[in-house]
Amino acid sequence: MLKKIVIGVTATAAFGIGAGALAGGSVDQSYNNTSGAGFYVRGEAGYGLVDKKSGTSKVNFTGVTLTENSHTNTKKSRGFNGRVAIGYAFNPYFSLESGFTYYHPAYRDVNIAGSALPLFSSVQAEGRQKINLYSIDLMGKATLPIDNFYAFIEGGVAYVHTKFVAFTETGTAVSPLLPPVTSSVAVKVPSSSKGYIRPKAGIGVGYNITQNIGVDVSYSRVFGQGKINNTNYLPNLNAVTLGLTYKF
């Protein structure tokens, strides 16, 4: 699905940019034919989502070990993604850029099951945890200018801050008595925050409207780590965005 989104957005943007250039007639000046050196600012907005993951782990409940199953809630883990950045272009082909990115929260659904306590034969409980995400990155960008158009690839590192919001898994415990006795259970999971330094990469195409203003469409990815049921879990963060650059 992600591949289709990237291809579709890129193709649409490229068609729109090309159509706009043709509609304006022949281009007398290529805005890429300058020294290219100087500072610039950039803003991006678009669509973010995380990869689907699932996993199993063991948790302690009243002194008894239960099985916890976790999986990504892909429907809720997608939405608005935004980034602001400042950079310096050494020439038309290479620049350094640092930015702050807000990611749409990720969600994981969890449930626990098993036997607990001598008086209870089975326990079933479930819940949903929200993961808030933002990052600060440092990226190197290689650009290939083609008249007023340009293509670019970028790579670097991102510090990703995550906050796992506290939540409660609720459900029932059923005793082996006759008749069975059903009781409510609640497993509270506290909030936690962590920071990660992870690789980030991106690719995109753009068009220089003037010597100072450019628009682009791009895809970027922060490579996560760990399994979804581990304490060091960070999902892969994907974003498809439209960008606007102003060159000083």
Swiss-Prot record:
Positions of transmembrane segments: none
Stretch forming the signal peptide: 1-23
Gene3D superfamilies named in the record: 2.40.160.20
Pfam families from the UniProt entry: OMP_b-brl
Location, primary (coarse class): membrane
Keywords for the protein's UniProt record, in alphabetical order: Cell outer membrane, Membrane, Signal
Record keyword Membrane present: yes
GO cellular component: cell outer membrane
Superkingdom field: Bacteria
Subcellular location field: Cell outer membrane
Name of the featured protein: Uncharacterized protein CBU_1260
Organism: Coxiella burnetii (strain RSA 493 / Nine Mile phase I)
Lineage of origin: Bacteria, Pseudomonadati, Pseudomonadota, Gammaproteobacteria, Legionellales
